[in-house]
Structures are given as structure tokens and as C-alpha cells.
Amino acid sequence: FDLDGGVLQWRDDAVKPAADMLVSALRVQTRGLSWPVRAPMPFEGSAQLDQTVIGIRGTATDTAAQAELSLGDIPLGRFAPYISSALKPALAGKLNAGGRLEWQAAQGDRPMALQLLSARVDVNELKLGPPRQPLASLKRLLVEDLRVDLVQRSADMGNLTLTQPQMRVQREADGAWMFEPWLVAAPNPAAPATPQPWRVGLAALQLTE
């Protein structure tokens, strides 16, 4: 199976402003297709989001899959409709990432498993607010050996490196911190929801100049 030159249009009206993205140059290649599945099927795919290259390569069956993912440099402004639901000031910077995704279907008493392993997230020239006088900035944010369990809702970082973090910390006379006006107030849900909270772990933190 070989798909070449595909186009995918993504629009999300649930956020304001609406998110509108165009994925082009979509290519998917697979070998050894069969049903029932007799052996892991190798696959490979690539696409472009604006000028950003997205890649995936792995193997899959009807009950399990694993894939190496890669995301080239992409401006954070591309995700502004989603970021603005949590932060009022604009967030600028460039993100690239990679990692291994593993999935296993539920079988018997064993629940479904979906994990991102050995992941790396690299954000450069991070600025919050006006570009010339940002409210906060970071030359580089690097997360290494990131492990995310999407079913168990946990994230463990092997190493977090922050390069040249800059932010003025201030508390107002009324006791409010300077960052409180930056945050968008969460809407009151119609009915209280109690999802399992996320657990986040960090093995090592480095601050560098």
C-alpha cells in the first residue's frame, strides 16, 4: 500500500479562535498487509505542517503497535488557539520533539496500554507576552528521557534543562502573584467531574546560563 501526496485539513471550532491547520505532502507506505494478521506489518509515513516535517516509522498488528515519531521545528504560534485557553499572553518559541509510541490492545483482564517512551522535547527562544519586553523568557527548555503513560495518566522526566530563564517575581499588596492575571479562569463545569489526576515525576533538573 502506498499513499503519496495526500492532504489533511484540520479545523477545530471548539476553541476560540478556531484552529485551522493544513497537513500536506502526506505519504504512507506499508508492506505485508494481510487479514488475519500473520506478522507485524512495517509502515512508514511523513507529512508537512507548513514547513515542519512530521515523520513516523514502525510496525503494527491488530493487537499491538510501536512507532518512532519525529517532529521538526514548529512555531508555538501554530497552537495559539489551544494555548490561549489557558494563557492570556501570547506564547512564542520553536518546538521539536521525538520519541517512541507503544500501544497494546486490551486482552482479558489486562487493560489497554498506550505509552510514549524515550521521548525528547526541545523548545527554543520561549517568550511569554510582548517579544521585546516579555513577561517571562527561556532560551531553551529541554526534556530528555520523557515517559508518558496516557492510560495511567502519568509523566516521568529523566532530565529537565532550563537555559537562561528570566522572569520578574512579584507579589502585589493584595497578596496576588504577578502571574495570576496571565491565567485564563477555568469555566465552571455543569456537573462536577473527578477524573484521575495526572502524576508527574522529575529525576533531575539543571539550570544553565
What do the PLM-derived regions correspond to, one by one?
Residues 84, 127-129, 133, 137, ...:
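A cross-kingdom feature marking solvent-exposed beta-strand/loop segments within repeated
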Residues 9, 128, 149, 167-168:
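Extracellular beta-strand scaffolds
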Residues 1-85, 91, 98, 112, ...:
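Elongated, acidic membrane-bridging lipid-handling scaffolds
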Residues 118-121, 125-127:
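Surface-exposed extracellular loop regions of Gram-negative outer-membrane beta-barrel proteins
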Residues 108-110:
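Single-stranded nucleic-acid-binding OB-fold domains
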